[in-house]
């Protein structure tokens, strides 16, 4: 792992330990059991069935590599705007220290619309998956660069037992081989290298030959223009996770519509 990823994972382990002391597992299970569920994978497939791109629209205030992306940041308004302009699902950053995210942002965004929501965070422990369910998330992210294969498989199984969808994220062919051992249909290819933070959409295009037909390829990071979208769709990649391009726009939902529809 890179220095930045090492640092993030170390912080996550500390956060999990603190959260477990604050909210015991049984209490969290009660919260999780009270939440309704929205079909994350089904929402993506419905867009595909209609011949449309499926956009997982991200709500992200900042990132370690780009700093603050959006000063005027009202998650509920952004969520409504995305829903009104054709998003299939939402992705909400809940990491506080590195991305200025919040659990509250996810709760506010989900309450503001009917779209399924991905908890975007660095998952290292099953406790975080139960947290995701308790806060209302419909899907979680597993990052191959941060997890070994047995742990990733264990975390996926636990997520599925809670009826959460799993998006597994990779950046290179070795990580893709690891991801293909999972059952989830959602394969995210991060065009940003978490070791160097360099970005190229070639990362997605160069791995398409590895992916079985029954999986859904989600291209992540570096999709900044209609030309990038057209390049991906020409390669039969029709599912996108986009944050920065929308967050930097005056009207995030309108930018989504301009780029994709």
Curated annotation (Swiss-Prot):
Its EC number is 4.1.1.48. It catalyses: 1-(2-carboxyphenylamino)-1-deoxy-D-ribulose 5-phosphate + H(+) = (1S,2R)-1-C-(indol-3-yl)glycerol 3-phosphate + CO2 + H2O. GO terms for biological process: L-tryptophan biosynthetic process. It holds the Pfam family IGPS. It is an enzyme of class 4 (lyase). GO terms for molecular function: indole-3-glycerol-phosphate synthase activity; phosphoribosylanthranilate isomerase activity. It comes from the Bacteria. Pathway: Amino-acid biosynthesis; L-tryptophan biosynthesis; L-tryptophan from chorismate: step 4/5. InterPro entries: Aldolase_TIM, Indole-3-glycerol_P_synth, Indole-3-glycerol_P_synth_dom, Indole-3-GlycerolPSynthase_CS, RibuloseP-bd_barrel. Keywords: Amino-acid biosynthesis, Aromatic amino acid biosynthesis, Decarboxylase, Lyase, Tryptophan biosynthesis. Belongs to the TrpC family. PANTHER family: INDOLE-3-GLYCEROL-PHOSPHATE SYNTHASE, TRYPTOPHAN BIOSYNTHESIS PROTEIN. This is Indole-3-glycerol phosphate synthase. It comes from Burkholderia multivorans (strain ATCC 17616 / 249). The lineage of its organism: Bacteria, Pseudomonadati, Pseudomonadota, Betaproteobacteria, Burkholderiales. The gene is trpC.
């Amino acid at each position: 792992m890179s220095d930045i990823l090492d640092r993030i994972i170390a912080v996550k382990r500390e956060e999990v330990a603190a959260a477990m002391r604050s909210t015991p597992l049984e209490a969290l299970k009660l919260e999780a059991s009270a939440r309704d569920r929205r079909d994350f994978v089904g929402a993506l497939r419905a867009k595909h069935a209609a011949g449309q791109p499926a956009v997982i629209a991200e709500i992200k205030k900042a990132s370690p590599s780009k700093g603050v992306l959006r000063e005027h940041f009202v998650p509920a308004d952004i969520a409504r705007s995305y829903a009104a302009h054709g998003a299939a699902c939402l992705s909400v950053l809940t990491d506080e220290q590195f991305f200025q995210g919040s659990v509250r942002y996810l709760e506010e965004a989900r309450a503001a619309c009917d779209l399924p929501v991905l908890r975007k965070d660095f998952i290292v422990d099953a406790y975080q998956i139960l947290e995701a369910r308790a806060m209302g998330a419909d899907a979680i992210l597993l990052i191959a660069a941060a997890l070994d294969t047995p742990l990733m498989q264990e975390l996926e199984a636990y997520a599925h037992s809670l009826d959460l969808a799993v998006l597994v994220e990779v950046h290179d062919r070795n990580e893709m081989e690891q991801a293909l051992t999972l059952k989830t249909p959602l394969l995210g290819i991060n065009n940003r290298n978490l070791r160097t933070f360099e970005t190229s959409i070639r990362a997605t295009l160069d791995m398409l030959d590895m992916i079985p037909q029954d999986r859904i390829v989600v291209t992540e990071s570096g999709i900044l223009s209609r030309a990038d979208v057209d390049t991906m769709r020409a390669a039969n990649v029709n599912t996108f996770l986009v944050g920065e391009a929308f967050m930097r726009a005056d009207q995030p939902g309108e930018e989504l519509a301009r780029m994709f529809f």
